């Protein structure tokens, strides 16, 4: 399979320092809004990278569920591989690849667990099928067959057929507190625009990076 000639031009526009707000969350909100308006598939999907005790990195796609000036929020099984990694090392990075808009956003930071109240508020807002699935799946554990998972799901569906479904103790969210956030916009002749916001106490320092 020949890969050398697979490429394309980037021509949707550049990013200039004059376009940048002082707070990166404002630009992220604008870009995410534009990704939604452009009807991109899964615009809130982000790559979440963590490392294990040996320093081996792992990545997976997770959906962003909330963001504001305090950080970026996602939810998971607290016994999952990513959650176990974060117990040992709270350093984390997030990546949003908005290819059709020729944009990327890369975030580094530290992950902190959400409160039980925050977990409950989001869990109860989910469709019932998703709530049951959270109970059924021991995320990242080995399965003998898919039938075992489906059987457990059906068993729990019957068990929780009436009334509210409680929040599993092994399920919850993380808030990624931002250390840095980079905005990448494709440019002509591979002269891409990259701007890095780095946290310096209570203010943001903005640097242009070479493509």
From Swiss-Prot:
Positions that bind FMN: 60-65, 75-76, 81-82, 104, 139-140, 184, 194
Magnesium in keyword set: no
Taxonomic superkingdom: Bacteria
Co-factor remark: Binds 1 FMN per subunit.
Gene3D superfamilies given in the database record: Electron Transport, Fmn-binding Protein, Chain A
A GO term, aspect molecular function: FMN binding
Keyword Oxidoreductase: yes
GO process terms (BP): pyridoxine biosynthetic process
Pathway as given in its UniProt record: Cofactor metabolism; pyridoxal 5'-phosphate salvage; pyridoxal 5'-phosphate from pyridoxamine 5'-phosphate: step 1/1; Cofactor metabolism; pyridoxal 5'-phosphate salvage; pyridoxal 5'-phosphate from pyridoxine 5'-phosphate: step 1/1
PANTHER family tied to this protein: PYRIDOXINE-5'-PHOSPHATE OXIDASE, PYRIDOXINE-5-PHOSPHATE OXIDASE
Subunit relationships: Homodimer.
Family annotation (NCBIfam families): pdxH, PRK05679.1
Family annotation (HAMAP family): PdxH
Protein name in UniProt: Pyridoxine/pyridoxamine 5'-phosphate oxidase
Organism per entry: Aliivibrio salmonicida (strain LFI1238) (Vibrio salmonicida (strain LFI1238))
Organism classification: Bacteria, Pseudomonadati, Pseudomonadota, Gammaproteobacteria, Vibrionales
